[in-house]
From Swiss-Prot:
The chain crosses the membrane at residues 5-25, 31-51, 53-73, 100-120, 154-174, 178-198, 224-244, 273-293, 296-316, 330-350, 360-380. Residues 571-656 form the RCK C-terminal domain. InterPro entries: Cation/H_exchanger_TM (IPR006153), Na+/solute_symporter_sf (IPR038770), NAD(P)-bd_dom_sf (IPR036291), RCK_C (IPR006037), RCK_C_sf (IPR036721), RCK_N (IPR003148). GO terms for biological process: potassium ion transport; proton transmembrane transport. It is found in: Cell membrane. May operate as a K(+)/H(+) antiporter. This is Putative K(+) efflux antiporter KefB. Keywords: Antiport, Cell membrane, Ion transport, Membrane, Potassium, Potassium transport, Transmembrane, Transmembrane helix, Transport. One of its GO terms (cellular component) is plasma membrane. The lineage of its organism: Bacteria, Pseudomonadati, Pseudomonadota, Gammaproteobacteria, Alkalimonas. Its main location: membrane. Residues 410-527 form the RCK N-terminal domain. Gene3D superfamilies: 1.20.1530.20, NAD(P)-binding Rossmann-like Domain, Regulator of K+ conductance, C-terminal domain.
Length: 661
């Protein structure tokens, strides 16, 4: 039953996606599997409600575009250059050998050579979408095996271009035409890369400096979308995939100080559209054929996983990489790829494959995707079990993984807010050779600091993705030096969610929000004005010849007591606009007729009003912390500490104004 109306279809699709994802998350099953199942249930091959596939597939393509853009942000040209031999050598060998092995195996089983070649090409692809999304979620995208897996899968996406050109002309016996077509595709890829890199490096940084200086989040997001889609359009106009252009644009942006904020801006679009992409893949499957072809498809999926795990492990191991890392890379790349679906569609359209064969291959690839999600998620446990059990514990690599630690993001300090205070902290950390990363949203400040090779990024610390990207899970300490209380609280709450045990020091302007910040999870709160007062007091005492040891002792006592003495202040008329809940000092004179005269402090029970008696002044003598049995006399002055509201109430009682009213 085809649902009528685009809006109705979209609402039904989104509602079903929300329901299935919630259901699968309760069972701790990846959301991508839920999306695939949604596609199967809402596709044209089932008896239930049917969503039109036309516009779904068009929308879904942008999911891959934004994903490749995000991947590009995390892969600088320097990283690609360092891995050039590994990527080109391993990538070519993996794609070529997988295609050849599968084709030879199927040909030996009686499958036509052309069909065997197509199936081999399909099986050679790996899903960059699943691999990168899963590794990003697990925080393994910058590990040694993660970078190898993503790099090789992106290379496979590039090799899909010649396959897309070759498959439609397999029936043509003119090798010269095929060679010229492939040569033209390579030329276009080089041209697109040159255009995006040259234009991007000279224009994008200046463009984003202007945009970020406007302090408009909407303008920043619009600019990110413009850059991503413009690069995608460029490569599409040259006959290449949109995803390839987005990847190039991402790599250019990844070399700027804006990359963390760019990734945060693109993420909502990426996640939603990727979900729709997986739905579109599920729509291709005909579940009615499963009883007939299920066993063949399952065998194909297992064959695909086995061949790729063994082959990739052997190839990576041959480059000198540790066995455990090689096996983990093999597990990651075992998954079938979405570009394989494009090859299937071309082969089906050109008559190379019949409908039944395409359904078998499609089902095999989908099954491999479902299984590979779990292989990727548990790649560490599986590699240590298999390598340690079958080959021996000595073969398991003991070297640290090439992840956050080897990028300077291990036991580091994250400074949220790189203004005057944040930079002061950074300078002392630099002197002590403590690694740190600064985050700030002042584009000019970030630009100047980066010119001096200071590790600061234009990024919003209130975005949890930013905190994840700077390795908060591996950090030693978080310093929040925002002047804006809202930004400080938001950053603090996200940090506590991501890393409950991380020590967090928060700077605040004064003592008025200390309690709120502590309640939100701050380990220490440093009121700027109070610390300045303590420093001034220290100099005063030293100039009065008070021993330095005694001065340090007094300062430390105040810090241990959470600045209790310095928080006890008398408020003036300029403080009337302060919140009534802010604690302060107030002196109350017990004049003639006060009901407090001739009563002991214990009988008076000032604590019931939520206030504290700090001292009593009698005949110009100051008595600090008087005993509870002391009896009050006329003309005594009580120095009280508490909120303005509580002090006012106590003052009315002590001066008998309530009785007078």
């Amino acid at each position: 039953m085809l649902l009528d109306g685009t809006l109705i279809q979209l609402l039904f699709l989104l509602g079903f996606m929300v329901f299935m994802v919630m259901l699968f998350q309760r069972a701790h099953i990846p959301a991508s599997i839920a999306y695939l199942l949604v596609g199967v249930l809402l596709g044209a091959h089932t008896a239930g409600p049917v969503i039109s596939e036309g516009y779904i597939h068009k929308i879904a393509e942008f999911g891959i575009v934004f994903l490749l853009f995000t991947i590009g942000l995390r892969f600088s040209w320097q990283q690609i250059y360092q891995l050039r031999h590994t990527i080109l050598g391993l990538g070519t060998a993996q794609v070529g050998l997988t295609t050849l092995l599968v084709a030879l195996l199927l040909w030996a089983m009686g499958v036509a050579s052309v069909v065997a070649f197509v199936i081999g090409a399909v099986f050679a692809q790996s899903s960059t979408t699943i691999i990168s999304k899963q590794l990003l979620e697990q925080g393994e995208d910058q590990s040694r095996h993660g970078r190898l897996g993503i790099s090789l899968s992106v290379f496979q996406d590039i090799t899909a271009v010649p396959f897309i050109i070759v498959i439609p002309v397999l029936g043509v016996a003119m090798a010269q035409d095929i060679a010229s077509t492939l040569g033209m595709a390579l030329f276009k890829a080089v041209l697109a890369t040159a255009l995006v890199v040259l234009v991007g490096r000279y224009l994008l940084r200046h463009l984003f400096h202007r945009v970020s200086s406007s302090d408009s989040a909407e303008l920043f997001t619009l600019t990110v979308l413009l850059v991503c889609l413009a690069a995608a359009w460029l490569t599409q106009s040259l006959g290449l995939s949109m995803a390839f252009g987005a990847f190039l644009a991402g790599m250019v942006m990844g070399e700027t100080e804006f990359k963390l904020q760019v990734e945060a801006a693109i993420r909502p679009f990426r996640d939603v559209l990727l979900g729709i992409f997986f739905v579109s893949i599920g729509m291709l499957l005909d579940p009615m054929l499963l009883p007939e072809i299920g066993h063949i498809a399952l065998a194909g999926a297992l064959l695909l996983l086995l061949i790729k795990i063994v082959l990739v492990t052997a190839l990576v191991l041959a480059t000198g990489v540790a066995l455990e890392t090689a096996f983990r890379t093999g597990l990651i790349l075992a998954v079938g790829g979405e570009f394989g679906f494009a090859l299937l569609a071309l082969a089906l359209e050109g008559g190379t494959l019949d409908s039944r064969s395409s359904q078998i291959i499609l089902t095999s690839v989908l099954l491999s995707m479902m299984l590979a999600v779990f292989l990727i998620r548990y790649n560490l446990q599986l590699s240590r079990f298999v390598v340690g059990r079958w080959i021996g514990q000595a073969a398991v690599s003991s070297e640290p993984f090439d992840d956050i630690e080897q990028h300077g993001l291990q036991q580091h300090v994250v400074i949220a807010g790189f203004g005057r205070i944040g930079q002061g902290v950074a300078q002392f950390l630099q002197k002590e050779q403590v690694p740190y990363i600064g985050l700030d949203l002042d584009a000019a400040r970030v630009k100047n600091a980066r010119l001096a090779d200071v590790p600061v990024f234009y990024a919003d610390s209130t975005d949890p993705d930013t905190l994840i990207a700077v390795g908060l899970a591996k950090a030693r300490l978080l310093v929040i030096s925002h002047e804006d209380l809202s930004a400080a609280l938001t950053t603090l709450r996200h940090a506590r969610t991501l890393h409950p045990d991380l020590p967090v020091i928060v700077r605040t302007r004064d003592e008025s929000h200390v309690a709120e910040l502590r309640q939100a999870g701050a380990t220490e709160v440093i009121p700027e004005t109070i610390e300045a007062g303590m420093m001034l007091t220290s100099h005063v005492l030293l100039m009065l010849n008070v021993p330095a040891r005694r001065v340090n002792q007094l300062v430390q006592e105040q810090r241990i007591n959470r600045y209790q003495l310095l928080r006890q202040q008398f408020r003036g008329s300029a403080d009337l606009l302060k919140t009534q809940q802010q604690e302060q000092l107030k002196a109350v004179l017990l004049a003639e007729g006060s009901p407090a005269i001739d009563q002991s402090l214990q009988m008076l029970d000032l604590a019931q009003y939520g206030i504290q008696l700090t001292e009593l002044v009698r005949a110009h003598n100051r008595i600090e912390q008087p005993s509870l049995d002391m009896v009050l006399q006329e003309n005594d002055v009580l120095v009280l500490f508490g909120s303005a509201e509580a002090l006012e109430q106590a003052s009315l009682v002590l001066t008998h104004r309530l009785a007078a009213d």
